[in-house]
């Protein structure tokens, strides 16, 4: 690592500590040339797949956009911030676990709907209405029927 004071290449680590709940390493370093000390922080770079949009464009995964979509669907619903954050982390974990460089926005949308279905059925229908572009009340009715059939199947098991 280069010294930020004299640009020398040789530095030594004096102290290392885990910070940010173990997700980051704080290192205290000393330049071997000018003896100045400085601090560096290291975090693992965990690449998430790029998202392939319906029109074929590709964009970086945006965690804030995911969170905003969940928050919008769950607005005025009895779901805690912790539950929302857990859902966000589950979705991110599934994205990473898939192990691909790119995933379709449709696949990601289905993941979001699965999480919402488990959290709150009203939020699920809200999100589905936008995601699937419901045009009329019949589309809502069909989605609610599909949801009820899934519930019945899971209760019968």
From Swiss-Prot:
Binds 1 zinc ion. Its cofactor is Zn(2+). Disulfide bonds: none annotated. The keyword Transmembrane does not apply. Residues 49-139 form the ATP-cone domain. It comes from the Bacteria. The keyword Zinc-finger applies. Keywords: ATP-binding, DNA-binding, Metal-binding, Nucleotide-binding, Repressor, Transcription, Transcription regulation, Zinc, Zinc-finger. A zinc finger (unnamed) spans 3-34. One of its GO terms (biological process) is negative regulation of DNA-templated transcription. InterPro entries: ATP-cone_dom, NrdR-like_N, RNR_NrdR-like. One of its GO terms (molecular function) is ATP binding. Belongs to the NrdR family. HAMAP family: NrdR (MF_00440). Negatively regulates transcription of bacterial ribonucleotide reductase nrd genes and operons by binding to NrdR-boxes. This is Transcriptional repressor NrdR. It comes from Coxiella burnetii (strain RSA 493 / Nine Mile phase I). The gene is nrdR.
């Amino acid at each position: 690592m280069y010294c930020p004071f004299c640009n020398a290449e040789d530095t030594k680590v004096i102290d290392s500590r885990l910070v940010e709940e173990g997700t980051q390493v704080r290192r205290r370093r000393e330049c071997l040339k000018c003896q100045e000390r400085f601090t560096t922080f290291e975090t693992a770079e965990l690449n998430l797949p790029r998202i392939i949009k319906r029109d074929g464009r590709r964009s970086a995964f945006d965690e804030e956009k995911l969170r905003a979509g969940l928050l919008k669907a769950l607005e005025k619903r009895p779901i805690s911030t912790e539950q929302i954050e857990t859902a966000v982390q589950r979705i991110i974990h599934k994205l990473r676990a898939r192990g691909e460089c790119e995933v379709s926005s449709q696949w990601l949308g289905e993941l979001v709907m699965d999480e919402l279905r488990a959290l709150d059925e009203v939020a699920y229908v809200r999100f589905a209405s936008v995601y699937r572009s419901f045009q009329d009340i019949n589309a809502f009715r069909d989605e609610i029927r599909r949801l009820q059939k899934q519930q019945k199947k899971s209760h019968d098991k």
